Amino acid sequence: MENELEHLNWNIKHALLQLEGPLAQELDSCLEVSPGALSPSNSVYQKILDTVQVLDKLLVTLTPPHMTLVDGVFAFTNSKVLLCASEYALADHVQKLQPCSISQLAEATGLHEQGLFQIVRYLREMGYFSQDPKTGLLSNNRLSNLLRKDHWATWINWVDFFPREYYDLLSRLPDQLRSDQPKTATELFYNTDKPIYQYLAETGRAAGFHKVTGTGSVVEAPGLLADYPWEEVKSETVVDVGAGVGDFIRSYLEKFPDATAAAFELPSTAEILKQRFPDDDPLTSRIVSITGGDFFQDPIPESSVYLLRWILHNWGDEDCIKLLRRIRETMVIKPGVSRVLIIESVLFDGRLGRGARYADIRMLARCRNKERTLGEYRKLAEEAGWRLNRVVSPRGCLTQIMELRPVGACTGSPRANGNGNSAGGLEWESELM
């Protein structure tokens, strides 16, 4: 085993020298996902994900158990340190001062220098900020840039939200798990019997929730709009069922100047959505309708293309099947065109499935529901009159796009040149696994 480990160490160190040296610029280019910069090579990005997945498995295999346990026990420290970085706008100050010393940063932020040094040291070990090995001066890097309040992706909204209220909320998760406890951790934390989304609306917390979900829409839009073949539905009105406050619709219409869309949401959220698309907004004329209602009871707008983004994970299997059947019954059938696009975080093993596992516990605590595996989504689809035709894993996203086609209503058969149901093979443009 010693020889194998020596060989492994040599190869890893050699790869690091290349990736941090002559390949650094190319790597940065491949990892940058933004509205104005998206590498034309999706295949290289997927190879990077393959490598991350394998290295994570290697890390899990080699790490001594006590180190893994300690990491789990103190994982909350990561969230709280990131919260400090956000609270005091460290990345924003570094951006103005860079390169800067800890003393300069402490003076600019009004923070205790020793405490700031410890926070920055922790952040550096997480990968945030670059530090000159000779001078010790700090600069932003591709990771710390995500903490800037002026960054296009607004990730800072997540950093401000989840380590605060959600952190406190999860303290009630052990209570929820008792077999005699009918309430969720969220209901216990807020001391309410009302459904969570109703409670958020009635207590003025809905705006903060939509701000966070809106960030997810903004962050994922470049990859979602680049890596799925939207040209196949360019002549159709895409109905966003559960559209939130319209962040995805805005990105979609901005990306495709000839596209049209429609939104279906709860009445209170639909009103907010209408306010975000006033008459003088040039995109408003391409929004066919904004409808308020209950998608289990009220009529859903007719179309041949529907989008459900971060919707099914809120509901149990029976409700998911009911909703998918309602859409199937409402859908305008156009062979080769009609489809519903399910955008969710699919559960799978390894590092690349970690985001979905985080979300799975959030859904458990929020509404006693869950994220699902690809097999579970396939089963839901089949029971509701659909078939899973294609799965796409877009760049820069925490989600996958699952394309469902109505059974018996479209020509062709599911394509199958993917790389299997593994995260690394998630060039799942894969089309059917």
UniProtKB/Swiss-Prot annotation:
Phosphoprotein keyword on record: no
Keyword Metal-binding among record annotations: no
Residues the entry annotates as binding S-adenosyl-L-methionine: E265, G293, D294, F295
Alphabetical list of Pfam families matching this protein: Dimerisation, Methyltransf_2
Any single biological process term in GO: secondary metabolite biosynthetic process
Induction context: The expression of the hexadehydro-astechrome cluster is induced by glucose.
Active-site residues (renumbered): H313 (proton acceptor)
Pathway listed: Secondary metabolite biosynthesis
Family under the similarity heading: Belongs to the class I-like SAM-binding methyltransferase superfamily. Cation-independent O-methyltransferase family. COMT subfamily.
Protein name: O-methyltransferase hasC
Organism: Aspergillus fumigatus (strain CBS 144.89 / FGSC A1163 / CEA10) (Neosartorya fumigata)
Source lineage: Eukaryota, Fungi, Dikarya, Ascomycota, Pezizomycotina
Gene designation: hasC
